[in-house]
Amino acid sequence: VRQPADFCGVIGLKPSYGRISRYGLIAYASSFDQIGIFSKTIEDAALVLEVMAGEDEFDSTVSSKPVPPYSKLIERKEIEKTTSPKKVAYFKETLFHPGLDPEIKTKIESYLNDLTAKGYIVEAIDFSLLSYLVPTYYVLTTAEASSNLSRFDGIKFGHRTKQSIADLNDLYKKTRTEGFGEEVQRRILLGSFVLSAGYFDAYFTKAQQVRQKLVDLTSTVFSKYDLILSPTVPTTAFGLGERNHSATEMFLADIYTVYANLVGIPAISIPLFTHSNGMPFGLQVMSASFN
């Protein structure tokens, strides 16, 4: 949600994991999936979240925490009554990543300086795990996807081929080849590979360990700071079909957004900036779970 929101100049909100029921959603990666919100205004995002959030007897992963009156909390008088300048962190490595557009870097740095001038405490902190985020995310999500999407076999779920079939395996093969797009097939194959006996410990187990390190790090950061800020995406929107030849390039566009998914915290992309190429781009704001 945050990446397309950034590209299109709108607000994109990913709530905390478990804030909104996933009942009715096709499961992709169950420990990551969270329904998000696109909106033109913060008020709309708050109102929609207030309506959608909360317990659901059909989803065991949804949180039972009470749903705050988000739409009331963001009214100006409430903000003025309860808000003081925050302690804000940003990961140094996010602004020095070689893939980050120099103009995006400059505008984010300028914004951080503006916050400091307004009385916010803004501090850079080290984040040595940045380069691990995308590999960890894709190892774990594709592993979960290969399991979740195995139910679409043409018998109990989903599309069923109309071609003549020789046996059950032939039914599976033709059905899944027709029913899944190229990118979905790529992710299923990658997930099946990392879960295979010879590679489970080398990839899946190590990715789980990195995820736990990230959770621990996040807990430490939010014990000292209220917010983490970063660019949402390293570049503005690229041309249609421009990166189709390189799955790796496409995956790396997620370098700033997957962190919140890995650790389950809420994150929002706010469209604050316009690039000299005329395209919008946003600031990503993250806070502790359910904050």
Language-model features, listed with the residues they occupy:
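Conserved active-site and cofactor/substrate-binding residues in soluble primary-metabolism enzymes
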Residues: 5-8, 40-47, 65, 102-110, ...
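Glycine-rich, small-residue loops and helix-cap segments
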Residues: 114, 118, 122, 132, ...
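Short glycine/serine-rich loop/turn segments
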Residues: 1-32, 91-93, 143, 230-248
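A short helix-breaking turn/cap at a secondary-structure junction
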Residues: 11-106, 111, 169-174
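Short, solvent-exposed loop/turn segments at the edges of secondary structure
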Residues: 6-8, 15, 30-33, 83, ...
